[in-house]
Structure formats: structure tokens, C-alpha cells
A protein has these predicted regions:
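Gram-negative and organellar
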Residues: 1-349
Length: 349
């Protein structure tokens, strides 16, 4: 996604963004088929009261089925229930102006807790219902539920325990449901006395189930992913990062056929600051699969500091591979040119 906004008045702004989506999860929920789509969105929002936003958007979507035009309007509201306890709520309705889209409604509720210096947590529940498309022979109506919960517990000055769960379910009126459930547990080490080294270890259980296609049956994928990420800053111009990840996956395919997959990935990056605003980097990655399969990627990049903690980098991988998304994380491992944007922030943002 790429976008921007313009402040036209003290409490009113115009905004626009372009979005590119591909795969099984669309902007409205989980799709029944993999697809690609572009979207151009522009609108206006106003803050009439403190912590209250009213918005209206015009969305132009170019999907496989053709071009759809939609008008979306809604409201977002924040409430301070107590010191360190804040609630949020939002409502949205989408009306199709032209095309074969469906009318949709959405509600969202959230809760954030920051009162305790040792504990922090948040949760968010979203509901979205999309109606039937009149031009199609079947009933395409569906309801999507998204529930996210996150918690952080500071163990001491340097160590923090992290937990997160992401639950996404889409129930179709005329067929089965699609489910994604991701549970993560992590441990972060960030020394307070210096900024030379930090590390994050994480283990994740991921479950994906698709019962929306009666001919294919109940498809399921279950995986365990373990990873460790570390950063080392030995001196002012040098930055070294490394990642080690492993994955064990079991898939249930059509007609109950079971398939198992396991792989590991090791990657590293060395960055040298030429000046305060320009850096050069070297990246290497190796992914090892089953039966001795091995792939590697090597590349270089150059970065420029746009503003404090915001870097824009461009690079080229001389060799590469299509890495597993759960193993590679946000690293780009394909062969060819790439552009990436990095933004560093903490819990005070």
C-alpha cells in the first residue's frame, strides 16, 4: 500500500492510497480463491469531537471480476474508561455504486491496558458481514470475525515476555467456513544500559482450515515455527543482524491425503553507515529443505535516511529463491531488484 494525506482544515483532512492485494486474504476477509486486485481509495475525515472521527471514502477496486466502485462511510470513537484503560469502537457501511460487489457492514471494538508498568495488553474484535451478489447464481454472502489479543510482561529491566493470538474466521452462507488461527509466544532481550545488542526469540503455532469447497473436502494446514532474531551494533557505523528459523508443517489435502514439510533458514545482513544519512549493506540467506534441498540468496543494498528512524533502501539480489514466508519474515530473498522501507519505533509511539 502507498498513500498520503493533506490537512485542509484544523480538524479535516483529505487522504488517498493505492493498495495491491494478492493471495487468500483480501481487504474484506478470507477469499474462497486466490486472487489479485488493485484498489484506489480517496476520502475525507473530520474530528468534530475529541477522539471522534467521521469519514467518507470512495473506493475503486479492479479485481478479476472487473471494476467495482464503492462508497464507504463510518465513525471511529475512543473512550478513556480509567487511567491506563482505553476503549475504541468503530462502525462502517459500504454501498456499491457500480459493479458486482455486495453491500457490507462492519463493527469493531478494542481495549488497551497500560496502567501497570510491568503489564501491557490489548484486544480487538471485528465483525463484518457482506451480502449476496445479485448477478451471481449462488449465494455469496459471508460473515467474517477477527479477534486479536496481545500481552507483554516485563520480567526485569532487560527481559520482556510477549504473547499474541490472531483468530480470523469467515463463515459462508452457502458453503463451509475458512479459518486461520495463529498463536505466538516470544521472549525479547533489550539491555537498558546500552543499545549495542538486542534479540527476540519466538515460537508460533499456525492452523489454517478451508471447508468452503465441498469437492475438495476439509483442507487443513498445521505448522510450528520457531525463530530467533538478533541485532549487534559493535560500533557507530556498523550494524549486524541475523535470523535463524525452523518450520514443521503437516497438511491434509484432498481425499484425506497427508503431506509433511520441514525446513530451516539462516540469514544475515551487514550494514555500514557511510554518513549519517547514507548506508551500504550486504545480505545472504540459505534455506534448507527436505532430502538435501538447499537454496541461497546474496545481495547488496544502499539506504537513505528520509527522517529520524525512517530509512528507504534499494538493492539487488544476484541470486535468490522464493523463501517460505513464515521463515523469511520480512526479508526479500527473490532474485532481482527490490525496494524496502524501514521504520523504527517503540511502545511510546
Amino acid at each position: 500500500a502507498l498513500g498520503g494525506d493533506y490537512q485542509v482544515a484544523e480538524r479535516t483532512r483529505l487522504y488517498g492510497r493505492w493498495e495491491r492485494q494478492s493471495g487468500w486474504v483480501s481487504l474484506a476477509g478470507v477469499t474462497d480463491t486466490g486472487r489479485s486486485a488493485n484498489a484506489l481509495v480517496f476520502g475525507v475525515d473530520s474530528s468534530y469531537l475529541r477522539d471522534t472521527q467521521v469519514f467518507s471514502e470512495y473506493r475503486l477496486r479492479d479485481a478479476v471480476s472487473g471494476r467495482d466502485a464503492q462508497v464507504a462511510s463510518g465513525i471511529r470513537q475512543g473512550f478513556d474508561l480509567a487511567e491506563g484503560l482505553r476503549a475504541t469502537a468503530a462502525a462502517e457501511t459500504v454501498q456499491v455504486v457500480s459493479g458486482d460487489g455486495a453491500r457490507a457492514r462492519a463493527l469493531a471494538f478494542g481495549l488497551d491496558y497500560t496502567a501497570d508498568p510491568l503489564w501491557k495488553g490489548s484486544t480487538r474484535l471485528e465483525w463484518r458481514h457482506s451480502g449476496d451478489v445479485a448477478s451471481t447464481p449462488g449465494n455469496d454472502a459471508f460473515t467474517t470475525w477477527l479477534w486479536q489479543v496481545m500481552a507483554a510482561r516485563k520480567l526485569d529491566r532487560d527481559w520482556t515476555l510477549l504473547a499474541r493470538n490472531h483468530y480470523l474466521r469467515t463463515d459462508y452462507t452457502a458453503r463451509g467456513d475458512v479459518l486461520q488461527d495463529r498463536a505466538q509466544l516470544g521472549l525479547a532481550w533489550r539491555p537498558v544500559d546500552h543499545n549495542r545488542f538486542n534479540a527476540l526469540a519466538k515460537i508460533e503455532h499456525k492452523l489454517e482450515r478451508d471447508s468452503s469447497n465441498a469437492a475438495a473436502g476439509d483442507l487443513q494446514s498445521r505448522a510450528w515455527i520457531a525463530s530467533t532474531h538478533a541485532d549487534w551494533h559493535p560500533s557507530r557505523p556498523w550494524w549486524l543482524t541475523g535470523r535463524l528459523a525452523a518450520k514443521w508443517q503437516t497438511d491434509r489435502l484432498e481425499q484425506g491425503v497427508t503431506d509433511k514439510f520441514r525446513a530451516t533458514l539462516v540469514s544475515g545482513r551487514v550494514v555500514y553507515d557511510i554518513t549519517e544519512r547514507i548506508d551500504l549493506g550486504l545480505m545472504a540467506a540459505i534455506q534448507a529443505g527436505q532430502h538435501g534441498a538447499r537454496q541461497h540468496a546474496v545481495g547488496v543494498e544502499a539506504g537513505y535516511l528520509l527522517q529520524q528512524n525512517l530509512w528507504l533502501s534499494a538493492g539487488y539480489n544476484r541470486s535468490g529463491f522464493k523463501g517460505d514466508a513464515d521463515l523469511a519474515g520480512y526479508d526479500y530473498t527473490l532474485r532481482g531488484a527490490f525496494v524496502r522501507l524501514r521504520f523504527k519505533f517503540d511502545e511510546t509511539l
